[in-house]
UniProtKB/Swiss-Prot annotation:
Gene name in the database record: Scara3
Keyword Amino-acid biosynthesis recorded: no
Spans within the Cytoplasmic topological domain: 1-56
Organism: Mus musculus (Mouse)
Keyword Magnesium: no
Lineage: Eukaryota, Metazoa, Chordata, Craniata, Vertebrata
Segments of skewed composition (Pro residues): 548-558, 591-606
Descriptive protein name: Scavenger receptor class A member 3
Limits of the Collagen-like domain: 456-558, 559-601
Length: 606
């Protein structure tokens, strides 16, 4: 199997770049990948490649063997047909010649058989004819033996054809099983690709979650920084307020001191009524100082009012920060809950993926065992095929030997046939000459018997054997006979030499699409698959119908105090009012300091 995966699934699946380009006949070859990079081929891929090459070589060897057996069978049958035709022609020719000889012998006059030389020649002819008949019987026996051998060769050819058909059926079943294995591998590859896509999606979601965690941490860090800044700012404002309160306390203590002084002045006003006139000059300065102090007090009151407004703004700003902090805490808690839920769902998915990966490993081990069993079965088939090929080779060797023996015997038969045909031609010529001589002698004897009027008595005993006469003079060449009947068709000639290869023809047009094949057999029912992972949450449902109106709720709590408005711009100074009436005389001031001594007076004349 071409099986591999990336990362932790290194030894799970090995996949090729060309898929599948040709997965209909051969098993796919996939390059192993390790962590997204192409790695070396695994041992299983090499075994699969060697198995494919061996199966292809076995297919080629089977086709060549079938072609060779068919060619040899055709050659053997052609030679046997030619031999049978030659033998049938020879038998027909011999039969015709024997029939013609018998007719000629029957046409002879029985009275002419008195001649001893003719009797001897007839006996010799009979002996030769018997020899020819014996040779023909031997030929018939040889033909019967050859027919038996031909029957044996036909039986062996039938055995070879049946075995080749069995081998082709076994190879077809092997190819069908390999095709089924390839289909199962394709389905398994599709499942593994889906698992890889899911793992990639999980990686992307984990990256998104980590990025969200980093963003939340950065937001919390920024919030902490802003809270620290606001705390420092509040601390500075508190310092300023402490300083202002200290100044106010100082002013209050001064005011109390002044009131005490004024009380002492009131108590001492009765006592110092005498010196009020002396210190009226200092009252103007003191009144001016009092007016200045009142103005400074008014300014201090204005500053205190501004500080109070600033404190109100700061308090509203702190309230806003508290609300923002509450919102951030709520969002962080919500994000934490969401992250916890996502991590729990991811843990569930990881557990389901671990279960699926375990099932994948079990399926891979099962397929590995199945492939090993298939390899063992293919090895057994290869051994049986090699044994069958060896037996077929031995049978073909013996067939070649028998064919060579048959060819030798056919050559001997042809030579004997040529010799017998020559001897028959010679004997037929001699017989024709003897028959002509016998006809001439018969005519001569007839004429003599007609001329003789003396009645012969009983024939006496035969006389002694005379001397052998001299060979007669060769008679004249006879006239040319009529044209004979057309003979039977001769045997087909030998196959001529193979011609030179012709030029390649033009590329033909693409033929029409073939008819759709028959539907394949229904596969066996698969085992129960493992439970699928938990599905994603469905889309949000439609808005339901409005429910009945509920009872009026209880009044809610009062809302927080609103933010103070922005302080307006200081208005332009108003017009100076009219001078008011003269006020009541103020409190008598304290006695002034004693003045410097005056100049010496003039001495009166008195």
């Amino acid at each position: 199997m071409k099986v591999r995966s990336a990362g932790s699934d290194r030894d799970v699946l090995c996949v090729t770049e060309e898929d599948l380009a040709g997965e209909d006949e051969d098993m796919p070859s996939f390059p192993c990948t390790q962590e997204g990079r192409a790695g070396p081929r695994c041992n299983r891929c090499q075994k699969n490649l060697s198995l494919h090459t061996s199966v292809r070589i076995l297919y080629l060897f089977l086709t060549l063997l079938l072609v060779a057996v068919a060619v040899l069978a055709s050659l053997v049958f052609r030679k046997v047909d030619s031999l049978s035709e030659d033998i049938s022609l020879a038998q027909s020719i011999y039969n015709k010649k024997l029939v013609s000889m018998q007719e000629n012998l029957q046409g002879l006059d029985p009275k002419a058989l008195i001649n001893c030389s003719f009797c001897r020649e007839a006996e010799q002819l009979g002996q030769e004819i018997r020899k020819v008949q014996e040779e023909l019987e031997g030929l018939q026996k040889m033909l019967l033996a050859q027919e038996v051998q031909l029957d044996q060769t036909s039986q062996t050819h039938e055995l070879l054809s049946t075995r080749s058909s069995q081998i082709s059926q076994e190879m077809g079943s092997c190819s069908f099983s390999i095709h089924q294995v390839n289909q199962s591998l394709g389905l398994f590859l599709a499942q593994v690709r889906g698992w890889q896509a899911t793992t990639a999606g999980m990686d992307i979601t984990l990256k998104d979650l980590t990025q969200e965690c980093y963003d939340v941490k950065a937001a919390v860090h920024q919030i902490n920084f802003t809270v620290g800044q606001t705390a420092e700012w509040i601390h500075g404002i508190q310092r300023k307020t402490d300083e202002e309160t200290l100044t106010l306390q100082k002013i209050v203590t001064d005011w109390q001191n002044y009131t005490r002084l004024f009380g002492g002045l009131r108590t001492t006003s009765a006592k110092t009524g005498e010196i009020v006139k002396t210190i009226q000059t200092t009252l103007g300065a003191s009144s001016q100082r009092i007016s200045q102090n009142s103005e400074s007090m008014h300014d201090l009151v204005l500053q205190v009012m501004g500080l109070q407004l600033q404190l109100d703004n700061i308090s509203s700003f702190l309230d806003d920060h508290e609300e923002n902090m509450h919102d951030l805490q709520y969002h962080t808690r919500y994000a934490q809950n969401r992250t916890v839920e996502r991590f729990e769902s991811l843990e569930g998915r990881m557990a389901s993926h671990e279960i699926e990966i375990g099932t994948i490993f079990t399926n891979i081990n099962a397929t590995d065992n199945h492939v090993h069993s298939m390899l063992k079965y293919l090895d057994d088939v290869r051994l049986s095929c090699t044994l069958g090929f060896h037996t077929h080779a031995e049978e073909l060797y013996y067939l070649n030997k028998s064919v060579s023996l048959m060819l030798g015997t056919t050559d001997l038969l042809r030579e004997r046939f040529s010799l017998l045909s020559a001897r028959l031609d010679f004997n037929v010529r001699n017989l024709s000459m003897i028959m002509e001589e016998m006809k001439a002698v018969d005519t001569h004897h007839g004429e003599i018997l007609r001329n003789v009027t003396v009645i012969r008595g009983v024939p006496g005993p035969p006389g002694p054997r005379g001397l052998k006469g001299d060979t007669g003079v060769k008679g004249p060449v006879g006239s040319r006979g009529p044209k004979g009947d057309p003979g039977n068709l001769g045997p087909p000639g030998p196959q001529g030499p193979q011609g030179q290869p012709g030029e390649p023809g033009p590329v033909g047009e693409r033929g029409p699409a073939g008819p759709r094949g028959f539907p394949g057999l229904k596969g066996s029912k698969g085992s129960f698959g493992t439970g699928g992972p938990r599905g994603q949450p469905g889309p949000k449902g439609d808005v339901g119908p409005l429910g009945p109106e509920g009872p009026p709720g209880s009044p809610g709590p009062s809302g927080p105090q609103g933010k103070p408005g922005i302080s307006g711009k200081t208005g332009s100074p108003g017009q100076r009012g009219a001078t008011g009436p003269k006020g009541e005389p103020g409190i008598q001031g304290p006695p002034g300091l004693p003045g410097p001594p005056g100049p010496p007076g003039n001495q009166s004349p008195y």
